[in-house]
Curated annotation (Swiss-Prot):
The chain crosses the membrane at residues 1-25, 35-55, 81-102, 124-126. The gene is MC2R. This is Adrenocorticotropic hormone receptor. The keyword Transmembrane helix applies. Residues 26-34, 103-123 are cytoplasmic. Residues 56-80 are extracellular. It comes from Papio hamadryas (Hamadryas baboon). It is found in: Cell membrane. GO terms for cellular component: plasma membrane. It is a multi-pass membrane protein.
Length: 126
């Protein structure tokens, strides 16, 4: 089994898992709170990262099959764009994790004021 096929499979599973998280939050009214909004943000970042890796693996597979010229202009540009988007997705995931950590901090140390500090309006702005 080729590494591209393994990464392709893992990326597809990652997209599906994050879609399940998004659907669960969207369908269940009890999960539509600021904390779950942050989790959705993380799921979207992770899903985009998986999608970019799927695109990159498709390019590699097409190159290995002879449909793309190795290190041609299109492949190099597409690979650079995909890598840049993947890094942006990674930064989005790190930011989402930081916001989730801040939300948990506020929940623990400012429990009585949590709902006045963390509002949906502020959540959307973040």
């Amino acid at each position: 089994v080729l590494p591209e096929e393994i990464f392709f499979t893992i990326s597809i599973v990652g997209v599906l898992e994050n879609l399940i998280v998004l659907l669960a939050v969207f369908k269940n009214k009890n999960l539509q709170a600021p904390m779950y909004f942050f989790i959705c943000s993380l799921a979207i970042s992770d899903m985009l990262g998986s999608l970019y890796k799927i695109l990159e693996n498709i390019l590699i597979i097409l190159r290995n099959m002879g449909y793309l010229k190795p290190r041609g202009s299109f492949e190099t540009t597409a690979d650079d764009i995909i890598d840049s988007l993947f890094v942006l997705s990674l930064l989005g995931a790190i930011f989402s994790l930081s916001v989730i950590a801040a939300d948990r901090y506020i929940t623990i140390f400012h429990a009585l004021r949590y709902h006045s500090i963390v509002t949906m309006r502020r959540t959307v702005v973040v």
